[in-house]
Amino acid sequence: MAGLGLALAGCGVQAQQPLPGGAATAGQDGLGARARARGIGFGTAVQGALLASDPAYAAAVMLEAQLLVPEFEAKWDALQPREGEFDFAPLDMVIDFARARRKQLRGHALVWHQAMPPWLPEALAEGPARARRVLEAHLDKVLGTTRGVISDWDVVNEPLANPSGSRFAALTPARGIFRETPWLRALGPDYIELALRLARQRDATLRLTINDYGLEADTPWAEQKRQAMLSLVRRLQAARCPLDAVGLQAHLQMDEPFRPEPLAKFIGTLRSLGLAVLITELDVREGRSLPAGLAARDVLVAGYVEAVVGTALAAGCRTVLCWGLSDRHSWLLRDPDVARRDDQQHRGHPLDMAFRRKPMWQALARAFAGR
C-alpha cells in the first residue's frame, strides 16, 4: 500500500489459518491473555443480546477478550429512552456476562451527539440551565448505578470537528475546533469540562476519557485533528479539569496513508501531559480497489493494523479494544455510511464470519509480543 510507511512484507503476516473445528476453542491462548502477559489490556465491544443468543459469539468473546465495552447498551437512548425513565436491563446483560467470567468493563458513552432519544435534543434546546439539569440527572443515575462495576468511561465522545479536507468535513458543521452538536449549542465548549467535572464528583475512582476518531493517519486533516485534541487537553488542564485519558478510536481506513512518526509523536505528547492513551474502537475499512482473493485482502488489513497498533504500543498505549471481534456482526456491514458500495464486505476484524482467526488476529498477537 502506497504511503503506509512500513513494508508489509516484513510484518510476518501469514495467510488465514482456520482453527480446528472452525471457531476458536478454549484450549488456546486468546488475544486477551497474550496482551495481559505483556501488561496490555485487550478487549472488544459486545452486544448483550448476542452474548445471550449466539453461543459461538459468546465463546469467542470469552476466549479472546479480557475487557468488554457495551456497543449500544450504555448510550443515552438505551439507558434513558424517556426523560426520567431509566432502563438498565440491556446493560445488565453485559455486566452479568462480564462478572460471571471475570472480565473488566468500560463504559461508552456518557455525552455524545448521536444515540440521543428524541426528547433529549428538545430539552437541550431549552437553554443552558435545563441542559445542565438533564446532564446532572443522567450522570447521577448512570454513574451511581454502575459505580464499582465500570471503572473507565468515555465521558465525552467525538467533541472535535472534522478539519477541512477530510472526507467527513462537509457532513459535520464546526465551531472552531469543536463539532457543532446539541451539547455545544446548549452549553458552549464548556460542556466538555462540565461533563468531566460532574463525572469526577459522582465517582472519584473513574478513569475519565475523551474519545475521538480520525487521529491516526498521515494526512493533513489527521494532523489538524491531533493538534485540536492537544489544544483541548491543554485547555482542560489549564482549567484544572479532571481528565485521565484520551481514546483513539482507530476506525482505520486503508485509503489513508500511515507513517509511524506522527502517531508516535502525538501519543508521546499526550503521555508527557500525564494522560493514558487507549485504542478504543479498532477496525478497518478496506480501500476502494481490492486485490483478488480474501487471503490477499486479509494480509493487507493485517499489515495496516500491525503498523498502527505496533506504533501505538511502542509509544506508550497500554489498552487496545476492537469494535467487535468478528466480521459476522460488524457495523462495517450494516451501517450505510461505512459499508462497501460494491458487492464485497469489509474484512476489518480479527475473526471472520465463522469466528476463525484471520491474519489480523496474528498481527495483533505479534504487536502484543513486541515483535
Predicted features, each with a name:
Residues 49-63, 133-142, 223-236, 303-309:
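Short, acidic/polar
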Residues 1-18:
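N-terminal export signals
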Residues 21-64, 71:
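Boundary/entry segment of secreted carbohydrate-active catalytic domains
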Residues 32-37, 55-66, 92-104, 143-147, ...:
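Acidic (Asp/Glu)-rich catalytic clusters
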Residues 25-34, 80, 145, 154, ...:
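Aromatic-rich peripheral "rim/lid" segments of glycoside hydrolase catalytic domains that contact
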Residues 43-47, 154-155, 195-223, 278-281, ...:
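Aromatic-lined carbohydrate-recognition surfaces of secreted/lumenal glycan-active proteins
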Residues 66-70, 157, 206-212, 229-256, ...:
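Aromatic- and acid-rich polysaccharide-binding/catalytic face
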